[in-house]
A protein has these predicted regions:
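Negatively charged, flexible loop motifs adjacent to catalytic sites
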Residues: 89, 101-105
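A Lys-centered signature of the CheY-like receiver
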Residues: 121
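Short, glycine/charged-rich "phosphate-handling" switch motifs in NTP-dependent
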Residues: 116
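Non-catalytic signal-transmission and effector/linker regions of two-component phosphorelay proteins
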Residues: 1-11, 17-37, 43-46, 50, ...
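Receiver (REC) domain active-site loop signature in two-component systems and cognate sites
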Residues: 70-73
Length: 158
């Protein structure tokens, strides 16, 4: 990824340590140099997002991308997805469901709840990392300057 993409932190919520290691290894071997944070279950991720975990949260969806497994202990991916999309600080967080579940009803449920993409494991990692690069780029491009009014006349870009 280019230096512009290094501002995006990739969060992986995956309870299977082997799957998580494989995902991280494949991302690194494809040249992804972004910070990657691994969460072992949905509750650990949710605690991080809410600032209650052991790590420090930035409390802002900008600059993050979430790879989310569905079947996890304590708090499953569907519940995490639903909570994130209902949260005013995190609802814009890009979420890619990355799971072994290929049931069309599950896929539709994830899309209805607001996931940005649904990928079934195992997957072709070159295509996956290319998609991440495109999504990361679009995250940076989508950010627009805020217009602040000046004494009731027009606005000023900030």
């Amino acid at each position: 990824m280019t230096s512009a993409h290094t501002n995006v932190t990739i969060m992986i919520a995956e309870d299977d340590e082997g799957h998580a290691e494989l995902i991280m290894e494949q991302l690194r071997s494809a040249g992804v140099s972004n910070e990657i944070i691994h969460f072992r279950d949905g509750q650990e991720l949710w605690d991080y997002l809410m600032g209650a975990g052991q790590r420090t949260s930035r409390h802002d969806a900008h600059g993050f991308l979430l790879l989310l497994d569905i079947v996890m202990p304590r708090l499953d991916g569907l519940e995490v997805l639903q909570r994130i999309k209902a949260d005013k600080q995190w609802h814009n967080l890009p979420i890619i469901m990355l799971t072994t579940t290929d049931d069309p009803r599950e896929i539709e449920k994830c899309r209805t709840l607001g996931c940005n993409c649904y990928i079934t494991k195992p997957m072709e990692y070159e295509r996956f990392t290319e998609m991440l690069k495109r999504l990361g780029l679009s995250l940076l491009v989508v950010q627009t300057p805020k217009i602040q009014p000046q004494n009731g006349q027009g606005g000023k870009l900030t």
